[in-house]
Regions:
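Bacterial N-terminal signal peptides that target proteins for export
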Residues: 1-10
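Extracellular/oxidizing-compartment recognition motifs
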Residues: 26-429
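C-terminal motif of bacterial Sec signal peptides marking the signal peptidase cleavage site
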Residues: 19-21
Length: 429
């Protein structure tokens, strides 16, 4: 479950997740750099999309975050030749940065998990290499913000009137150093930025998962549909610079399937029992997987892990693939008296905070003659197994489970191996 990662993050005093090179290629820029300083924030405002939806009414255990991703876009013309550019950023919600359509940074789930009212982490990047530095050249800054860590269930208790965070927001300051040595600050405001609900991410939150429609263009390609933002005054705490990523994606620890099977019906059902799945076919690890309408494909990665699934797959435009996560299988002929929620061999989800509509990825294919790569970047899951369905035929050429952690590979200074396989497994977890 998601608590598995949160406990780890709390112990480490950090909250960060990762992601490099997905949904848009390898992240660019020259990486994290020193902050511009607290006084630079005075040149900026928190801004939100005026058309962003807000969750209202008493929040229940199954309440989902508001639909849509907020996009913020600004185009800036260089007054002189630029020799250096630093962008100091902060978000109310999970945010991803782009310069001229190229992703910035290798972190995932910025800004990470902090006390919602007291602190937010800022991330400052050297983006000089992504800019057109010539005099009078235009450069586009854009940001996607989704509800995670702010306007979703992870920080909102049941019974609260709406989510604790109402609208996603972004705040940033760009420092340009010109060829003559002068510097100028450009901060977020309602005059020079556009904002709106846009892009392929149509829903995302920590407990909910992510809905991604590849037929939709990112916000930096649909600026004409955006409008003036509004000032957001929800957060009154401190913005503190991060010391590095709060969460790391660990592709070096990626898990491959150990077992894959397909079922479509169950047998042996009786009063109080769902029965047992009838396995229609199995796939050897490493083989392509075919998903047909009406089928359930169960993929076992062999161990529970805080992670995100990574796909290479292909399907017809408009086809939706749904991937739901689980920590265990139903057993005992699906006996309801044992808390089972489906036939033996199907994935068990009754233990989840949002068992019906949460902990899932919905991916709708766009037009492509080739297989495409996808990994959700605005959420994470705790799971060992996934169950996959599709509205039309889909071929999965590759699927992996990519761990997320508060510990980067560079922080690992050694390994421990014992003569006991179970202890070795515990250590590796």
């Amino acid at each position: 479950m998601n608590n598995q990662l949160l406990i780890n993050l709390a112990m480490m005093g950090a909250t960060a997740m990762l992601l490099a090179g997905c949904k848009g290629g390898q992240a660019g820029g020259d990486g994290l750099t020193t902050t511009l300083g607290n006084t630079a924030w005075n040149q900026s405002q928190w801004i939100s999309a005026a058309d962003a939806k807000v969750v209202t009414g008493a929040v229940q255990d199954g309440t989902r975050a508001a639909d849509g991703a907020s996009w913020f876009v600004s185009t800036l013309r260089n007054e002189q030749k630029v020799v250096s550019a630093k962008w100091m950023t902060a978000g109310l919600g999970v945010y991803e940065l782009y310069v001229n359509g190229k992703p910035v940074g290798n972190e995932i789930l910025k800004p990470g998990f902090t006390h919602y009212a007291k602190t937010k982490r800022s991330f400052t990047y050297d983006i000089t290499s992504l800019l057109n530095t010539k005099k009078s050249a235009d450069n586009m800054l854009s940001v996607q913000v989704t509800p995670g860590w702010w306007a979703d269930k992870i920080i909102t208790p049941a019974g609260h009137d709406g989510m604790i965070g109402k609208k996603c927001a972004f705040r940033g300051v760009l420092e340009l150093t010109f060829a003559d040595g002068t510097k100028k600050l450009y901060g977020t405001n309602t005059a020079d930025w556009k904002a709106g609900i846009a892009g392929p991410v149509t829903h995302a939150a920590i407990f909910d998962g992510e809905d991604y429609d590849a037929r939709r263009q990112p916000g930096y390609n649909t600026v004409d549909k955006l409008s003036s933002p509004e000032v957001n005054t929800e957060f009154g705490g401190d913005i503190l610079p991060t010391n590095g990523a709060e969460v790391y994606l660990r592709p070096d620890l990626a898990l491959s399937p150990v077992k894959v099977y397909v079922w479509e019906r169950a047998e042996g059902a009786k009063d109080g029992e769902y029965g047992k799945v009838v396995v229609k076919r199995e796939y050897a690890p490493g083989r392509s997987i075919e998903v047909h309408p009406g089928e359930n494909v169960v993929v076992d990665f062999g161990q529970n892990c805080a992670a995100v699934p990574s796909f290479v797959f292909k399907g017809k435009e408009g086809t939706t693939l749904t991937c739901v996560m689980s920590e265990l299988l139903n057993d005992g002929n699906g006996a309801k008296s044992r808390g089972m929620d489906g036939p033996e061999g199907s994935v068990h989800r009754l233990n989840l905070r949002i068992p019906d509509t949460g902990m899932r990825v919905n991916y709708t294919f766009g037009h492509s003659d080739k297989a495409v790569s996808f990994m959700p970047t605005a959420t994470f899951f705790g799971y060992r197994l996934v169950s996959i369905t599709a509205t039309d035929d889909v071929t999965i050429e590759s699927i992996k489970s990519v761990p997320v952690s508060s510990i980067s590979k560079s922080l690992e200074t050694g390994t421990i191996t014992t003569g006991n396989d179970l202890i070795n497994k515990l250590i590796s977890n």
